[in-house]
Amino acid sequence: MMEVIDSVLGDRQSAIQLIDESKKFHQDALNYFNKCIDDRDVGLDYHVISVFGSQSSGKSTLLNHLFNTDFDTMDAQVKRQQTTKGIWLAHTRKVNTTHKLDGPASDLFVLDVEGSDGAERGEDQDFERKAALFAISVSEVLIVNMWEQQIGLYQGNNMALLKTVFEVNLSLFGKSHNGHKVLLLFVIRDHVGITPLSSLKESLIAELEKVWSELNKPVECEDSSLYDFFDLEFVGLGHKLLQAEQFQEGVKRLGDSFALKSANPYYFKPQYHHNLPLDGWIMYSENCWEQVENNRDLDLPTQQILVARFKTDEVAQEALSLFHSKYSGSVDHILDDREKLGEVLKNLKQECLIYYDERAYRYAEPVYLEKRSELAAKMEAEFRKTIGNFLDQLSESLMQRLQTEVLDKKNQHLPFQKRTKILVQSTKEEYWTAVSSFQQLELLRSTEEILQHFDEQVDTKIKQLKNDEVNTLIARANKSITLKVKEQAVHYLSNPERDTWDKILDMFEKTIQSSLSKYEISEGHYDFQVGFTEEENDSVYKKVCSRAWHVLNVTVHDYLKPDTIVSILRDRFETKFRYDEDDSPRLWRNEDEIDRAFRIAKDHALEVLNVLSFAATSDHVEIVPAFGEDNHEEDECYEDELGIQHSRHFAHILNELQKEKVLQQFRRQINLTVLDSKRSIIKTTTAIPIWMYLLVVALGWNEFVMVLRNPLLVTLVLLFGVGFIFVNKFGLWGPVLNVAHNAVAEVRITAKEKLRAIVMDEDEKRHLINSAGKESYEMKDMSDSDNEKIEKSE
């Protein structure tokens, strides 16, 4: 059962038995501490003091006089026996001092440890060792209470127990010594002054150093000294009964060192404190006792870290819950406003970190900072999502604007490379400004990945725009090249000569060069001003040329079909056959002249057949496209719908079979032309006999005279004769017949309408006559009835 001592002082809580004699830790210690501090923010401004010594040596009495506590004390007049059982804890802010303090002292928590070497426990030293270990683990100042006459003894002055304390201290702090110390305050009771305090001090120090030298130290602590882990102070107090005034005065002077920071010495030094907030110290002390009780290795720094981790994590979770409760509602409506978004996120982060700092900064600094960093990272992870959404919207907007401005006509006066460089720089600067603003507000820890991702987006967009620009450039160049190449190539092929292909090649190269002249930087080298490397520019040039060759290839092969070639040869033949050197029509006089002209014209026509069937220069070199128009991965020959084999090479226009067919058709057509010419000679040589003219004059003289005497008839005869000759010569009988047919049709339609009108007029007249008779009859009836009415009335 836990025992509780009722306090007789109104401003402090009763002492509690922190650890009972059954080695059980008080389960309601936290509630006791909360009552002691009364909701005040104590922070690290508290101190823990422990006392141990022999049983019935006046430990509790000393604490009650020094700190105004109410620990139970022994009544020596009744019986000397064990009074303090287990470890008791009391809280106080009142310390006995030589003069009145301006205000209450810091919160002091005093541990009264069960006395050692008691008859009640006998040889069972387990609890006293564990109690001493616990006291040194949790306290800043360890008061060693002893009598003057015990100095020089080994068991009597607790040197054996101190040896255990030293060994335990090395096991606790030796491996990871971080400057933490414990003050050993030796209070020598019943010091009557015969032996000077300095002499007693020297004796105790000598004994302590001897004990230290005999310790079994860990390897890493072999060279350590007593003073690396402990500070030593010595105080003498007079006899409580025989020297009551001196005792009280000594207690007050001792109180000055606990209450006054200006006192010399002042016992509460920073290196003594465990740097745990009060609620953390409670958890820490409970963990320490659990480790001690279970005989586990007690690593105090680790225990402090564990407590700090637990408490800081608890506070961090509270701060994070606060963050989540305010986050969504604060940012949803301002996602498109960078300044407001940054301000809201910054304020929310600061609010949560302040909440964490106020409650966690007192714990171990490395743990506090680590958890703070984790908390900030968790908030930044949420920020990253929100800021990421904002940056995605901004990125999309900037990409759209970049594309619009690159394609804007007002910027077209600048080369593509120059205008994209300017626009990309401004776009990146705007994005970088937005990202850096969030980073300056400490909302983004790292921006390298974000900026790298945006740069990749910009590069992708610029690459796309480059490709679009190049495709537009190629299309524009090919359009210009296509028009010129088709027109000029067809012209040259329609009027072939021996050097036709030389002219076509020269025209083709000049057309490409003129279309790309503004991009030419040197002979054969081009810069299309889109930021391409030399190899990429060369690739674009080759692509333009390749498409131009394709156009030429299609134009040539589509135009030079067998029928077209026959027509070209026939036109060439007829031009040479029908016209002389002055381009005047020939008048044939005899067949020999026709045969001679036929041979010349035929040879003239056939001399270009090879030109039209195979593309080669005048030096008989086959024309091969410079940029892969002939590089077919398929077979070099293919078969058309008629089963005729064709070559895929540019130069191969007609195969041998096609040439033979062209020759056959050509011969047939020119043979017909020759026959027509020879028929015209026969017609001109067949003349009308002279006697026939005389007979016509003799028999038709009267009619001839009649015509001459009638001018109108002469005029009509001349008009009709000229018209007849004109129509007959130009073959206009078809249009004349159409006009006559249309005129007759119009006359027929007009006649029908006139007849219809005449018939309609007759019908209308009859209808009017009938209508008039009926009306007169009705009027007569009405007049008769009126007369009858008049007669009746009379």
Curated annotation (Swiss-Prot):
Q: Which GO terms describe its biological process?
A: endoplasmic reticulum membrane fusion
Keywords attached to this Swiss-Prot or TrEMBL record, sorted alphabetically, are: Coiled coil, Endoplasmic reticulum, GTP-binding, Hydrolase, Membrane, Nucleotide-binding, Transmembrane, Transmembrane helix
EC annotation? 3.6.5.-
Query: Cytoplasmic topology: which positions?
Result: 1-687, 733-794
Specify the enzyme's EC class, one word.
hydrolase
Using the record for this protein, list the coiled-coil segments as residue ranges, or answer none: 331-352
Task: Provide the GO MF annotations for this entry.
Answer: GTP binding; GTPase activity
How does it sit in the bilayer?
Multi-pass membrane protein
Q: Which SUPFAM superfamilies match?
A: P-loop containing nucleoside triphosphate hydrolases
Q: Which cellular component terms (GO) are annotated to the entry?
A: endoplasmic reticulum membrane
- Which part of the chain is the GB1/RHD3-type G domain? 43-272
Q: Which residues cross the membrane?
A: 688-708, 712-732
InterPro entries reported for this sequence: G_GB1_RHD3_dom (IPR030386), P-loop_NTPase (IPR027417), RHD3/Sey1 (IPR008803), Sey1/RHD3-like_3HB (IPR046758)
Q: Where in the cell is it found?
A: Endoplasmic reticulum membrane
- State the function annotated in the UniProt record: Cooperates with the reticulon proteins and tubule-shaping DP1 family proteins to generate and maintain the structure of the tubular endoplasmic reticulum network. Has GTPase activity, which is required for its function in ER organization.
Q: Which family does it belong to?
A: Belongs to the TRAFAC class dynamin-like GTPase superfamily. GB1/RHD3 GTPase family. RHD3 subfamily.
- What is the protein's name according to its record? Protein SEY1
Write down the species: Zygosaccharomyces rouxii (strain ATCC 2623 / CBS 732 / NBRC 1130 / NCYC 568 / NRRL Y-229)
